[in-house]
Amino acid sequence: MIGFRKGIFLAIILTIAGCEKKQSTVQTQLERGKYLVTVGGCHDCHTPKIMGSGGVPAPDEKRLLSGHPEKERYPRWAPTDMQERNAMALTNSMLTAWSGPWGVSFAINLTPDKATGIGEWSEQHFTDAMRTGKHQGQPNGRDILPPMPWFNYKIMSDDDLKAMWAYLRSIPAIQNQVPLPQPPKK
C-alpha cells in the first residue's frame, strides 16, 4: 500500500511539473512576442498617440495596436509635395495614416477583434502576410503599403512570427474599423 501511495504521489508531482513546464513555455512565447512587437516598432504606427509631456506624442495605452482611429482625419499628398515641401510622404499627428505616391495607407487594427481587427485571421494568414506583403497573405490580396516594412519581417523565423501572433491574440480586442487604403490622386 505504501508503494501505491508513493506511485500516486509521484504521478501527481510529474503531472504538476509537466503543466508548469507547458505554462512557462506559453508564457515565454507571449513574452517573446511582446518583445518582438515592441522592438519591431509595431506601436509606432498601429497604436494611436496622445500628447505626452513636453509635446512628445505617446502611445495611447487604452488603444494599443488598434490602428488608425476610424473617424480621425488623414493626410493628403500631391506630386507637387516632393518639390514644394521636399516631402516623400506625409503623416497624421498619430502616425497611423500615411500618404505618398502610393496613395493613403492606414495602420490596420492588430487586436483580436473579430469584426474590425485580425480576430478572423489565422496564424497562417499572419505569417503569409509578413512573408509576402499581401493583406492576409492572400496571393491576389491587396498590397501592404508603405510605410509598413513587411519585407523586414519576411526574414524572421517561423517561431518568432508565431510568437508575435500569440502575443497579438492575447491583447484586448478593440473595435475600430480602419478605412481601406486609398489609391493615389492623379
Describe the predicted segments one by one.
Residues 15-18:
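C-terminal motif of bacterial Sec signal peptides marking the signal peptidase cleavage site
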Residues 3-10:
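Sec-dependent signal peptide recognition
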Residues 128-136:
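Glycine-rich, acidic and aromatic/proline-enriched surface loops and short helix-turn segments
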